[in-house]
Amino acid sequence: MKKARALFTPEAARLIATLPPEIKKLVRASIDELLVNPESGSELTGELEGYRSFKAKRYRIVYRPNDAETTVEILLVGHRRDVYDALRSLLTGE
């Protein structure tokens, strides 16, 4: 399978830029891994259906694969404690 291309939302790019260097390195390696296999993350359910989450230790990368365009849209990166609430807020515009 061809490696997917990453598309970062402005919010995801901003969040990655603010991470500590060791976490940033871990997140980048995890993104590279999910670009090779976009289905490797967990499917989200309920109001977050259609999105996936990839674990990077205590952090989560929330993304949406697009097989037709061979892209992966990275929506958010954050600590597992609050990333899903942040995603809900992002999706509802709050």
For each of these PLM feature ranges, what is it?
Residues E33-N37:
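Short proline/glycine- and basic residue-enriched helix-capping loop/turn segments at helix->loop/beta transitions
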Residues M1-R28:
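Arg/Lys-rich, positively charged N-terminal/basic patches that mediate binding to nucleic acids
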Residues K2-R5, T18, R64-E94:
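Enriched for short, Lys/Arg-rich terminal
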Residues I31, Y59-V62, L87-R88:
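Enrichment for repetitive, rod-forming helical segments
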Residues E39-D82:
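Basic/aromatic recognition patch in beta-strand/loop cores that engages polyanionic ligands
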Residues T9-E11, A29-I31, R52-A56:
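Short, functional N-terminal and low-complexity linear motifs
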